[in-house]
UniProtKB/Swiss-Prot annotation:
Domain notes: Consists of three domains: the N-terminal catalytic domain, the editing domain and the C-terminal anticodon-binding domain.
Gene that encodes the chain: proS
E.C. designation(s): 6.1.1.15
Job of this protein: Catalyzes the attachment of proline to tRNA(Pro) in a two-step reaction: proline is first activated by ATP to form Pro-AMP and then transferred to the acceptor end of tRNA(Pro). As ProRS can inadvertently accommodate and process non-cognate amino acids such as alanine and cysteine, to avoid such errors it has two additional distinct editing activities against alanine. One activity is designated as 'pretransfer' editing and involves the tRNA(Pro)-independent hydrolysis of activated Ala-AMP.
Catalytic activity: tRNA(Pro) + L-proline + ATP = L-prolyl-tRNA(Pro) + AMP + diphosphate
Primary residence: cytoplasm
Superkingdom: Bacteria
Subunit note: Homodimer.
Descriptive protein name: Proline--tRNA ligase
Transmembrane annotation, as ranges: none
GO cellular component, one term: cytosol
UniProt family annotation: Belongs to the class-II aminoacyl-tRNA synthetase family. ProS type 1 subfamily.
Classification via PANTHER family: MITOCHONDRIAL RIBOSOME PROTEIN L39/PROLYL-TRNA LIGASE FAMILY MEMBER, PROLINE--TRNA LIGASE
Amino acid sequence: MLASKFFMPTLKENPSDAVVPSHIYLVRGGFIRSLSAGIYEYLPLGLKVLRKIENIIRKHMDDSGALEVLLPILTPAELWKETGRWHVYGKELFRLKDRKDAEFALGPTHEETITDLVRKNVRSYKDLPLNFYQIQTKFRDEARPRYGLIRGREFIMKDGYSFDVSEEDAKKTYEVMKEAYHKIFKELGLDYLMVEADVGAIGGKFSHEFVVKVPSGEAHIVYCEKCGYAANVEAAKFHHHKLPPEEPKPIEKVYTPDIKSVEDVANFLNVPLTKLVKTLIYKIDDKDFVAVLIRGDRELNETKLANLFKAIDVRMATKEELESLGIPEGFVGPIGLNLPIYADFSLKELYNIVVGANEKDYHYINANIDRDFKVSGFYDLATAKEGDPCPVCHLPLKETTGLEVGHIFLLGTKYSESMKAYFVDKDGKEKSIIMGCYGIGVSRLISAIVEQYHDDKGIIWPENLAPFNVHILVLNPKDQESLNVGFDIYKKLKEKGLDVLLDERDESAGAKFKDADLIGIPHRIVIGKALKEGKVEYQKRDGSIKELVDVKLIINKLMDGYHG
């Protein structure tokens, strides 16, 4: 491809709304352009990269036995109402009506659509197993689309769905998909972690995320360097060290004037934070109030709380709601509280604790569970953090940020039961199909790759993902010999099967080098002043090679260094 004929609108300045490297370089390099908030156009360079990523995904999905389909983007509301997700998704779901007032959604995922397809066509165990996937545009009305392709309102996703006769078979399929995902992300050259994850609005029995390690990532991960345990903080567990037992002391109400925060109470009473217990009042699905107890040095994990109640939404009670319950803000405690009380595991063997007295300016000291108040049970409700003991080997956990690029779920019968997707087994009994679902953020992968492959000048594409294999720069296209040599090398490399970009534009050498660094093609041949001595310069974008090579040897030299 000749640069003079190619559409590559590079920019000298960073976009005003771009803060992460991938957003900056993909826009500046002419890979993408924003049409509206969270909606992007893929220009020729960007589309070439996208297609290469899609082909790698297709290869491994096909090799795993999955079958490619293409489902409608527009899905009838009736299907979403069958599973209850019409209401669960809330404002994130794009909804519309046709001219007959029939309701539809623009699909953010396709569990309902694929389950409808299967229930209409599967009757017997002989029709199973099935494993489908598609690569398709999805829609989600994000409240705050940001970071370019990382969080958009329109995005490209690989979503897959498996259907099995038993949970045992479904787990085997899940493992096959898990291995396929490992192969995909390794071929993409990503430094990633597979972590335990929360099932979220998709639902199901368990799930894993594939998270690319980047500083700008929105996913917070804890992991163990020793045993390999890793989990999203929303789902992460940790080992609870047992505190030494104590003899219960007499409970006592103490005056704590206008002291509300746990840190201030601990300092005022001269006790460690581990002796304080926070009593948090939450509203579940905007209906019922509950009290949640957590140790003073820990933070409540709202995702774990929502999962405990199988709730769509949990939120802390407002000051007005606390007043309506007769509870003063800042002094909430479990004693005499007329609400169900749920405690974190960390309180199970905690004695002589400090709690609010449900009275302004007062706390109780030496309160004890069972003697002074009852709880409905002990649950894993705390957020794991760096330094907590690993739940497997008990060594300290580490914390990092990352970008979720893949998510797999064992759904069980969540969708098949609600949508009546049944099959008849060998014994003639009707049973629900066991499902799994498997997603990859295809367009997000472009950003993830750039986040890990860039420097202060631009992108450094891996060889198998670069929009072109080789970039030839003719620094002085007005010199006929330089132009002839450039075209000769261009022709020979194309005959070798390489995809080559020849920059023969009438631009300054500086502009060409800046564009070349920005778009990040891994191999570069520079035709400049050294041609007078019969040499051209061979460079690798990552800076590992920069040397003069005889013109007659440049093809062999490049082919020796090419591994795409």
